[in-house]
């Protein structure tokens, strides 16, 4: 697999398997977390940030769907509300949209309508800029951000976990692409260690960029259980591994490619997130909660329609990194196989998806 920061991005464009057309679930997650963002803006104003001429915010891992537009609109709306309540001067809002270099910034900015940004004569003038690069390192000058938002991005890792091959060069997570019930303990330990390292790097970079008392609102894909091999946190990757294994058995994929591939993502528990933040010591935890949503739109009666929708959603965020390992030419067959395996499981109750909302304040001093 190539370097993660070169191959990790959502499916580009606006076609039927693009992220832009298959982000309904993450939109639902974002809407559930929107009160936390609204409260963060309220908190900033309570700390006299309304005295500033401009509020600077960043949406990290913004991708190219409509979610980031909702973030901008929410921040702007809350600023306008506080301006009217506090009779403060006209404010300016600077928003930086960040993602890795492979992100579809063209589709992103093409969708940035005047309805989102508004005009420069309103109570809050809004200016938007793109910032390509990895949020695991520094992106902005010191003490330049008042508010940081990130949704469904921080659980991605900078690389596949280290130490997943034996001294003899044998794969320790053979036949799997993520933590599973059959994975040896070293696999779980390696994933947690990599997440700890990467999330700590993220916090360290933001601690230098966020002003004292500034806020961060982070939404992560997570889990309720303390065991990362429970189906709630490995369901998607388990089905993908089964689909890949079937293509291996048909001679369409080299077995070694499966055995040496481990997804660079980790869905943490609330306790793990809390522990890392407290160990870092740069931020206080204002709010931490987990909530569950159905993985599929259960109001759709036809299981094939439901399965197809879920498969397209999964393909939208997994295909670039999966195709880099297994080849672009096999993707249609792989996700068709994934859909068939998924539909055969739809008779049973599927695990709900857990999301984590984490609100942090930069410690003064």
Swiss-Prot record:
Q: Which residues bind Mg(2+)?
A: 173, 259, 261-262
Could you tell me how activity relates to pH for this protein? Optimum pH is 8.0-8.5.
Tell me the pathway. Answer: Alkaloid biosynthesis
The protein's UniProt keywords, in alphabetical order, are: Magnesium, Metal-binding, Methyltransferase, Transferase
The cofactors required by this protein are:
Mg(2+)
Where is the secretion signal located?
A: none
Gene3D superfamilies noted in UniProt: Methyltransferase, alpha-helical capping domain, Vaccinia Virus protein VP39
What would be an example GO MF term here?
methyltransferase activity
Per the UniProt record, one Pfam family is Methyltransf_7
Q: Which domain of life is it from?
A: Eukaryota
Is this entry keyworded Metal-binding? yes
Q: Which residues bind S-adenosyl-L-homocysteine?
A: 19, 62, 67, 99-100, 134-135
Q: Does the keyword RNA-binding apply?
A: no
Its function?
Involved in the biosynthesis of caffeine. Catalyzes the conversion of 7-methylxanthine (7mX) to theobromine, to some extent, able to convert paraxanthine to caffeine and, slightly, mediates the conversion of theobromine to caffeine.
Q: What is this protein called?
A: 7-methylxanthine methyltransferase ICS1
């Amino acid at each position: 697999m190539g370097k993660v920061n070169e191959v990790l991005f959502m499916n580009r464009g606006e076609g039927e398997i693009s992220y832009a057309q298959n982000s309904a679930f993450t939109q639902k997650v974002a809407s559930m977390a929107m009160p936390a963002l609204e409260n963060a803006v309220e908190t900033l104003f309570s700390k006299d940030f309304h005295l500033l001429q401009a509020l600077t915010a960043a949406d990290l891992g913004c991708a190219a769907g409509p979610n980031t537009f909702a973030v901008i609109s929410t921040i702007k709306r809350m600023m306008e509300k506080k301006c009217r309540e506090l009779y403060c001067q006209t404010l300016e809002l600077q928003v930086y949209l960040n993602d890795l270099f492979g992100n579809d910034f063209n589709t992103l900015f093409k969708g940035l309508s005047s309805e989102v940004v508004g005009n420069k004569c309103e109570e809050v003038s809004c200016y938007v800029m793109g910032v390509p690069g990895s949020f695991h390192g520094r992106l902005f000058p010191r003490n330049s951000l008042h508010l940081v938002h990130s949704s469904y991005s921080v659980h991605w890792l900078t690389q596949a976990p280290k130490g997943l091959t034996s001294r003899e060069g044998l794969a320790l997570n053979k036949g799997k692409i993520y933590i599973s019930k059959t994975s040896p303990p070293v696999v779980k330990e390696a994933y947690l260690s990599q997440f700890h390292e990467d999330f700590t790097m993220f916090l360290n970079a933001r601690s230098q960029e966020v002003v004292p008392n500034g806020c961060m609102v982070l939404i992560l894909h997570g889990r309720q259980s303390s065991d990362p091999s429970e189906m709630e946190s490995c369901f998607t990757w388990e089905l993908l591994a089964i689909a890949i294994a079937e293509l291996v058995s048909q001679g369409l994929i080299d077995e070694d490619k499966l055995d040496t591939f481990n997804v660079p993502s980790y869905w943490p528990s609330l306790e793990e997130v809390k522990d890392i933040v407290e160990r870092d010591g740069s931020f206080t935890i204002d709010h931490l909660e987990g909530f569950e949503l159905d993985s599929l739109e259960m109001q759709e009666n036809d299981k094939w329609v439901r399965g197809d929708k879920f498969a397209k959603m999964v393909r939208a965020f997994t295909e670039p990194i999966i195709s880099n390992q297994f080849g672009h030419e096999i993707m249609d067959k792989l996700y068709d196989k994934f859909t068939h395996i998924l539909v055969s499981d739809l008779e049973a109750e599927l695990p709900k998806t857990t999301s984590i909302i984490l609100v942090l304040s930069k410690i003064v001093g």
